[in-house]
Amino acid sequence: MLPLPSELQIQAQNIQQRFYELPAPLSLREEDIAVLVLSDFVSDMLLIHPDWLDELHQQPPQPQEWQFYQQWLSQALAEVQDEAALLAALRLFRRRIMVRIAWSQALETSSTTDTLQQLSWLAESLIIAARDWLYQACCREFGTPCNSEGVPQPLLILGMGKLGGGELNFSSDIDLIFAYPENGQTQGGRRQLDNAQFFTRLGQRLIKALDQQTIDGFVYRVDMRLRPFGDSGPLVLSFAALEDYYQEQGRDWERYAMVKARLMGGAEDHYSKELRQTLRPFVFRRYIDFSVIQSLRNMKGMIAREVRRRGLKDNIKLGAGGIREIEFITQVFQLIRGGREPRLQERALLPTLQAVAELGLLPEQQVADLSGSYLFLRRLENLLQAIADEQTQTLPSDSLNQARLACGMGYVDWVAMNAALEQHMQAVRLVFDHLIGDDAPDIGEDPSHGLYKSLWQDVLEEGDLAPLTPHLDEAARSQLLVTINHFRHDVDKRTIGPRGREVLDQLMPRLFAEVCPRPDANVALSRLIQLLLSIVTRTTYLELLVEYHAALKHVIRLCSASPMVASQLARYPLLLDELLDPQSLYQPLEPSAYRDELRQYLLRVPPDDEEQQLEALRQFKQAQQLRIAAGDITEALPVMKVSDHLTYLAEAMIDAVIQQAWNQMVARYGQPSHLQQREGRGFAVIGYGKLGGWELGYSSDLDLVFLLDCPLDVMTDGERSIDGRQFYLRLAQRVMHLFSTRTSSGILYEVDARLRPSGEAGMLVSTIEAFADYQQNEAWTWEHQALVRARIVYGCPELQQKFDAIRQQILCRSREGSQLQQEVREMREKMRNHLGSKQRDIFDIKADEGGITDIEFIAQYLVLRYAATEPRLTRWSDNVRIFELMANYDIMPEAEAAALTRAYVTMRDEIHHLALQEQSSKVSADCFAAEREQVAASWHKWLVAAPSDV
């Protein structure tokens, strides 16, 4: 044992003093101090439970004692009579055994592999004991869940990730998936439930037993987001539902996660075997699958971007050469060849690596290096987390904790330990880059010689620019030189370290080589400089632009085309990561993929960290909007598709925000009790305006109205129970808050809820009955116009059906033609007076006569006027398809419908492009003359001429 460094000697003295001051003073042995100086967690636990120290002396921890955990836990739970006692006993047992594991780890009486097995088996024992106790309790209350033949059905639990692989770290959370074999109903209880309801309640109680913070702490943070459909999916699924999901919708990343999946409890009953057999074809393909490499490379790229975004320096899990890269290397072989090589189907990493060596897939020395590095990093991770029983993989910056880790790892000081760490991580990175590697940086031809270098580093005259910019006139050259000199002066005022200056000196000649030959060199450079000033002190992003020449070209192309994009990149430089993959940059996601991509993105953020969740939502939105804008700029996306993508993106964000708000509310109050007897959440959101009409722009706000379906006498089922309708009101308020909170990444969306019944004077959330009553008896014509463009954007099917029926009933109401014309005209006149341009030489594309709003009002009038005789006119909420319906049902001539559609799409396209230029919707009065003439003629025909004349 190495002598303690000075920082730990002081710590030892403090610890001895604290134990001496106990009511029954304890003197510590030398080996006690050797452990206690490394871990505040162990010290604190033994001060609270001094008898545990006697136990450690009398029965020192043994490497294989994990085999007795279930027996010891069974004894600890023998007297438990209720759930409160269960929660207390589970927490106490976990702390006691964690102290023993930390003790054995510090004294190295257990190897690192022993420690990982102990941690994993402890978690499994606690999960299974809690499940079994709660299963019996639920059966007493609700009866035993049975299939159609009366056979009792169990709850099976898949442990995912490191838990599944038997490699859990010291302060890990646990990833679980719940399943049950067959549908059916409970038998023998006080009340009958179907199996889905029974197992959902059991699952909720199990999560609470493990995850809830009490006076005794918690057992494990439980993460259920790896289940099918994530947080928005059922908590528990039948085997058939699981099989359907993974066969029809399973994603690559879910396949990788399933490699380590293991049934908790080691059960060998026929249900367990059936579930394993069901999942196996999804995980391991019968053929050799080389598509895995690119998929894993994409996942690694996402993680690397996350490290940059969250500023994760010194991260031994996610950093280059860290634990995650060793896991990726191993998974490559499992997923490519596992279907044909049973030896590669191991869940644990080290045995899989050994099989890789035996099969000759990697040289033995590389496998030995990877195995050694893995054990080094896992011990370091466990020692780091054992300091305070906190889940972290970031190395400490303070001298005390650095000394603890160096001592625990067997090094004389932090410098020596860090050198060994660097060596291990470099060895891992070499193998990773060879096997998976990021796409090679495309540095391209080095332009830093000659005049481009002089342009940055020397004082040049205008004449010196001529060879570089022969296409520019003198005024343009002069302006270019002024811009460069101002930038150089601004940079000199910034605090840039030597490395930052070195990288900037490499970058600027390359940038000039791309910008100077452009005809718009001045515009491009002025926009790029705003970006450069925002990242000049952040060397990581400068290095990205130096190493990836293609990324630099994309930055120049996009900033030159759009000041909006340039402003976004300058404000949020993390978006530069999106430029590394041109294939995805100019091709936005499939519209149906936004929800799944966002779900995967949020999996990397702790579910209980609201601040990180808010940042992640905003960063995802900005990244996707950048891709949509890139597709728009390059004309890869037509105008209708731009709005479609922006709308699908907004719907994905709404879904995620409501999920986050729901989780927070349920954690605080429980859920409304009426939901136990039904599907869904009794909550829906109506999208109005541009969201409802699939017509969102880059800066559109969201017009939302919230609906609830909850009886009057319902309360929530949590410890802090509140009225059910109060729950939904607070839920809606929480949703509004999550959208509008300003973080370092800005707000998510501006949300306007004023279209709700009675506007700002009305309740934020309406019952579906109150909404129907208001629309039938109190709503103005303009509110019925708004209903034309309304649709459900979030909600359970039952509420959606009710809303659709109300909408159709209102829109199909018989209306007198001339009165409707007058009311629509009057509303339009009010809007024009309020919003329209007052200048005769200006045309506001949105608000002025002959513009987009006139077209929208024509569409709304036609639906309100003719849906009574042709209800199918209410089918769509967007203007383009409304005009299509009008032509199909012979209400409007086909040529007129096509002309109005063309005018509408043309103007919308211009508004998108003006937004990319950060310009308003006001243009010269000469613009869109033909379109405005068509709109004016249609306006007169439908809204001015007597209805009988039409």
UniProtKB/Swiss-Prot annotation:
Adenylyl transferase: annotated segments: 449-950
Annotated region described as Adenylyl removase, given as residue ranges: 1-440
Organism of derivation: Yersinia enterocolitica serotype O:8 / biotype 1B (strain NCTC 13174 / 8081)
Gene Ontology terms, MF aspect: [glutamate-ammonia-ligase] adenylyltransferase activity; [glutamine synthetase]-adenylyl-L-tyrosine phosphorylase activity; ATP binding; magnesium ion binding
Lineage: Bacteria, Pseudomonadati, Pseudomonadota, Gammaproteobacteria, Enterobacterales
Gene label: glnE
Keyword annotations of the record: ATP-binding, Magnesium, Multifunctional enzyme, Nucleotide-binding, Nucleotidyltransferase, Transferase
Record-stated family: Belongs to the GlnE family.
Entry protein name: Bifunctional glutamine synthetase adenylyltransferase/adenylyl-removing enzyme
CC cofactor: Mg(2+)
Enzyme class: transferase
Cross-referenced SUPFAM superfamilies: Nucleotidyltransferase, Nucleotidyltransferase substrate binding subunit/domain
InterPro entries: GlnE, GlnE_rpt_dom, NT_sf, PII_UdlTrfase/GS_AdlTrfase
Gene Ontology CC annotations of this record: cytosol
Function: Involved in the regulation of glutamine synthetase GlnA, a key enzyme in the process to assimilate ammonia. When cellular nitrogen levels are high, the C-terminal adenylyl transferase (AT) inactivates GlnA by covalent transfer of an adenylyl group from ATP to specific tyrosine residue of GlnA, thus reducing its activity. Conversely, when nitrogen levels are low, the N-terminal adenylyl removase (AR) activates GlnA by removing the adenylyl group by phosphorolysis, increasing its activity.
Entry superkingdom: Bacteria
